[in-house]
Amino acid sequence: MRTLYVHIGTPKTATTSIQMFCVENQKVLNKQSYSYPLLDFVYPHVAHRRNGHFLVGWVYKPGGQEDVEKEQELWEKGLAMIHQEFEKYDNVILSDENIWHSSNGRKFPFWAKLMQDAKEHDYQVKVIVYILSLIHI
């Protein structure tokens, strides 16, 4: 079954290194039927390698108000990207450190929306999370 891997980076667990590895090794991943797609749109102050940011990203209007319509537009573009990648690869990997932070906040409903999309488009979702042992802090 096609699988969407969602890497939710907890603090100090090498999320940036994992993202950079995936970007730099795209050809190797592709040969194994994995894709780490880069979005064709960007969020201000968010590194391009954070391809899962559309799941929880905030967008603001020039006056500082949240732009819910734009957030929905980017959500739909991000899902369309996943669907396109599944036409070529069996596995798609997304990663963003804000997913961890947003899982307890106002953006939490994205999980239900993502699971609904997975059901409608016949893929499964697996979450990857690394936890840093407190003894190392």
Residue spans for each PLM region:
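PAPS-dependent sulfotransferase catalytic core
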Residues: 1-100
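Short, surface-exposed linear patches
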Residues: 28-30, 114-119
